[in-house]
A protein has these predicted regions:
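Alpha-helical, largely C-terminal catalytic domains
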Residues: 1-185
Length: 185
């Protein structure tokens, strides 16, 4: 089990974007904490979509949510600014990192997620940004106003991914996300 010791390190790997905006390391969210919130919001949104009669593979959603940042056990936390500029290279690195961790069987899942090739992948992408937004709001309310650009960027990304969802899904997910965001006010 090559992956076990490396993946456990995600409990201690602080998300760099928060540090760059003045969040003290002792208060900064870790990759594992972020992953939990991504998985939980993915679960809740998927259940709501399913309850409206639309199809979502809940197992795939949860698997993608749990795996989406596993490569960071090898790569470290790569900030969005860098990812946006070297997207294709980061996607290749993600696959190499999974190999190094002995998790080759998760490569297809990562490819689908990174290509945004399904409703499930888009839900996880939305929830990845929603989890970042939720944590950013916590920091903002604690007085860390420097996180505002992350809040704005997360909302912009959420809206972009919602627009990519098929008709029917997009309105349901948009309404759920808006309820979550309003509940933070």
């Amino acid at each position: 089990m090559i992956w076990l010791r490396r993946v456990i390190n995600l409990y201690n790997l602080v998300r760099t974007g928060w540090l760059l905006r003045g969040i003290p390391p002792s208060q900064a969210e870790t990759v594992a904490q972020h992953t939990f919130l991504v998985a939980f919001t993915s679960l809740m949104i998927s259940r709501d979509v399913i309850s409206k009669g639309l199809s979502v593979d809940l197992g795939k959603v949860l698997s993608m949510a749990l795996v989406h940042d596993i490569p960071e056990a090898v790569e470290g936390d790569i900030v969005k600014w860098v990812k946006d500029r070297v997207r294709g290279d980061v996607n290749k690195l993600d696959l190499e990192a999974l190999s190094e961790l002995g998790l080759n069987d998760l490569k297809d899942l990562m490819l689908e997620l990174n290509s945004e090739g399904s409703v499930e992948a888009l839900i996880v992408k939305i929830c990845d940004n929603l989890a970042t937004y939720i944590q950013g709001r916590v920091y903002y309310e604690l007085g860390f106003k420097e996180v505002n650009d992350i809040l704005e960027g997360s909302l912009s990304s959420i809206n972009e991914y919602v627009r990519k969802l098929p008709k029917g899904y997009n309105e349901i997910v948009k309404n759920i996300v808006n309820k979550v965001i309003r509940s933070l006010s």
